[in-house]
């Protein structure tokens, strides 16, 4: 065992995989997505982790795919034993966002996900779009991105605490049960990633002390 702490397992989702694969068999993206979803569901049903997270970095720029993406993602989630999470961001290539879009365009999709909580990008984009999440299904926890993974600057604990305060003022107490980086740290040096995680913890503690 690598840790005594609760384990989160992450997996690229069926929409993202469908958008980047060449289809030489199905001739239909919805059918391809569901075939991928069936394989992922079978594999993830055997994962003994506290949280299983599906990563989708393409749907943010393609709300027109919501119907078939939702069916495929939910099919995967139905096979998860532990807590179900879905991460959505706007992509990252060389420190730049890949997708263009707005969270409000995804609200019907987000509200129909069979998920316990969302893991969303905010730090890079800012928090002006938080108002849209007043319409989020109250049974779905909102995970707030408070660390920008496309910038080498390490946030101060005070900056992170203020981001949490903004979210609570906008959405109300208890609507943001999770905080996290916007996405993965693979583009950053280890020292920067470690510094950002330390700042995240310190910012959370500072925010909790102010409440």
Name each model feature, range by range.
Residues 1-211:
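Domain-level signal for soluble alpha/beta catalytic cores
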């Amino acid at each position: 065992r690598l840790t005594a702490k609760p384990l989160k397992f992450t997996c690229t989702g069926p929409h993202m995989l469908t958008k980047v694969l060449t289809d030489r068999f199905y001739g239909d993206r919805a059918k391809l997505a569901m075939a991928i979803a069936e394989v992922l569901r079978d594999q993830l049903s055997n994962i003994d982790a506290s949280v299983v997270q599906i990563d989708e970095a393409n749907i943010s720029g393609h709300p027109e795919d919501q119907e078939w993406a939702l069916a495929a993602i939910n099919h995967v989630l139905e096979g998860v034993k532990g807590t179900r999470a879905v991460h959505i961001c706007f992509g990252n290539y060389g420190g730049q966002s890949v997708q263009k879009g707005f969270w409000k365009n995804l609200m019907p999709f987000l509200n129909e996900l069979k998920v316990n909580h969302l893991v969303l990008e905010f730090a890079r984009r800012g928090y002006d779009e938080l108002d849209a999440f007043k319409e989020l299904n109250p049974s779905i926890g909102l995970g707030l991105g408070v660390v920008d993974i496309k910038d080498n600057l390490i946030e101060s604990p005070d900056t992170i605490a203020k981001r949490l305060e903004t979210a609570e003022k906008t959405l109300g107490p208890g609507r943001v049960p999770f905080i996290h980086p916007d996405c993965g740290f693979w583009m950053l040096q280890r020292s920067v990633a470690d510094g950002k995680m330390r700042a995240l913890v310190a910012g959370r503690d500072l925010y909790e002390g102010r409440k």
